[in-house]
Amino acid sequence: MKIHAIQTGTVAVKTRQREGVGRGKRRLLNTFLDREWTDPLPILAWAIEHPEGVIIVDTGETARASEPGYFPRWHPYFRTGLREWVAREEEVGLQFERLGIQPAEVRWLVMTHLHTDHAGGLHHFPKSEILVSRVELEKATGRMGRVRGYLNNRFPDWFQHAA
């Protein structure tokens, strides 16, 4: 069995978000008011080459996140609380191919959650079985999903039926 950590770009967030200053709405307010940014942090995905098949834990971010208009301008977090840098060659599908893992060979995707820095690479794996908690799926795809920071309009068309 082999385990690979794959960096699919970098992200900077407000220092108070990373430190978890406050609780509930106070924590959110602290994040928005913070003027300090973290150094760039790695956005990671994981591949586990297992005897029963390849398992991917999270799919990292997509290079489309670096394009103007990818994030909703109306959302204050995406406008003021997040900076991402992702090059096309950093996308998870291309990196796994360089390791000799074809996306079509990936048996399972284990999604810790469905924010874009963890689910941005879903489009590379249309044939994989997706494992995600029902609560997380409902939060991400429900009426309030976009307000909660999920880019459910960016999920692949096949995703709703596969999860």
What are these regions (language model features)?
Residues M1-H4:
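Extreme N-terminal starter segment of soluble prokaryotic enzymes
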Residues H123-P126:
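Short, conserved loop/helix-junction motifs that constitute active-site signature segments
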Residues L82-D117, R134-A163:
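Metallo-beta-lactamase
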Residues G60-T62, H115, E136:
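Catalytic metal-binding/acid-base residues of hydrolase active sites
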Residues V57, T112, V132-S133:
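Active-site flanking residues adjacent to catalytic metal/cofactor-binding acidic residues
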Residues T8-G93:
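Conserved beta-strand hairpin/beta-sheet module of binuclear metal-dependent hydrolase folds
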